[in-house]
Each structure stands twice: as C-alpha cells, then as structure tokens.
Amino acid sequence: RFKKIRRLGTLPGLTSKRPRSGSDLKNPLRSVKRSQYRIRLEEKQKLRFHYGLTERQLLRYVHIAGKAKGSTGQVLLQLLEMRLDNILFRLGMASTIPGARQLVTHRHILVNGRIVDIPSYRCKPRDIITTKDKQRSKALIQNYIASSPHEELPNHLTIDSFQYKGLVNQIIDSKWIGLKINELLVVEYYSRQT
C-alpha cells in the first residue's frame, strides 16, 4: 500500500496514510519526463487502487460506461461511486474501501432489508443501507463511525448514525468525488489498448 501511495499520491479509499513530501524521498534528483502513456497508466492505476478493483473489473466498467449515454468518464465515475463498498466508505461506516468490502462479504450489511454480500452491488437512489440487528454488526459499525474523521458527507447520501442507517438520495454529482483524477485519461488508456 505504501509503495502505491508513494507512486500515485493520496488514495483515500485504500488507506488514510499520506505520502511524504518530495524532499523526504530517497532520490529527489530523479525527475524524468513522463511519457503520455505513463501519465494515462498512472491515472488508471489511481482509479484501480482507490476502488480496489482488478484490471478485468475496471475494464468491464469502462465497457459499460462506453455504451451508456453521456460522457464515458463521468458515467464510469458514477458507476464506481455507486458500488455498495464505496457507499459504505463514503457514509463513514468503514475506514477504507477494503474494510467496507469485508463488512459486506461477512454479511453485516442489509440493503432495503435484505442481506447483500456482494461488494460490487450497484446501489440505486432511495436505497436504504442498514446493519444487521446482531450486536456484533452494530458494534463494528459503531466503532467505525466513532473513529472516522467527520468529513462533509456528499449531498447524494444521508446517514443516521444512531440507527446505523444510510440513505442514497440520488446519483452522485461529479464534484463530490473524493479523488483527484482525470477520468478522460483512463478512458483514453483503454481506447488505445483495443
């Protein structure tokens, strides 16, 4: 993880750690001109590692976004942001996306009253996300909510931290995406691969 954030910059979904400043690194004199391919590859890797996707999963999302109406890059980010594991991370119910994925796969999370154990489940507007009634599930979520820094919640989500309940109000607006990324470079990367 640390090698990834050192190379790609801050990835809030992967870890809360921050890369050191440039003066602390071992070899600050190695400033090589980056090729266009490398820039596109780094943007793709940022997206992949932030959301914790495999290469095949990201490629599938790019194909789905390409077939949808609208800007491919914007649709791609909306698809990734509406994944259940990412929604849990954004609500503050998990400290990282891998932590949220573990909550989902261990069957602690309900969507609209039904257990969902697939982290890539695509949430829709008006979905209600809650925890199981078991004490262990509630304790896990309570610890995450208490320990997470209270950042501003995106306007497409609302949380009731006393009932351990989150609500998806609408599809995310692009300005609320918490990752500094140029999604067009990711789309370009894949368009040049085929």
UniProtKB/Swiss-Prot annotation:
Biological role stated in the UniProt entry: One of the primary rRNA binding proteins, it binds directly to 16S rRNA where it nucleates assembly of the body of the 30S subunit. With S5 and S12 plays an important role in translational accuracy.
Annotated S4 RNA-binding domain residues: 82-143
SUPFAM superfamilies, per database record: Alpha-L RNA-binding motif
Bilayer-crossing regions: none
Keyword Glycosyltransferase: no
GO biological process: one example: ribosomal small subunit biogenesis
Family: Belongs to the universal ribosomal protein uS4 family.
Organism: Furcraea foetida (Mauritius hemp)
Gene behind the chain: rps4
Key words of the record: Chloroplast, Plastid, Ribonucleoprotein, Ribosomal protein, RNA-binding, rRNA-binding
Subunit details: Part of the 30S ribosomal subunit. Contacts protein S5. The interaction surface between S4 and S5 is involved in control of translational fidelity.
Compartment(s) of residence: Plastid, Chloroplast
Keyword field contains Phosphoprotein: no
NCBIfam families the UniProt entry points to: PRK05327.1, rpsD_bact
GO MF, any single term: rRNA binding
Region (Disordered): 1-29
InterPro entries membership: Ribosomal_uS4, Ribosomal_uS4_bac-type, Ribosomal_uS4_CS, Ribosomal_uS4_N, S4_RNA-bd, S4_RNA-bd_sf
A single Gene Ontology CC term: small ribosomal subunit
Record's protein name: Small ribosomal subunit protein uS4c
PROSITE patterns the record matches: RIBOSOMAL_S4, S4
Coiled coil: none
Taxonomy, superkingdom: Eukaryota
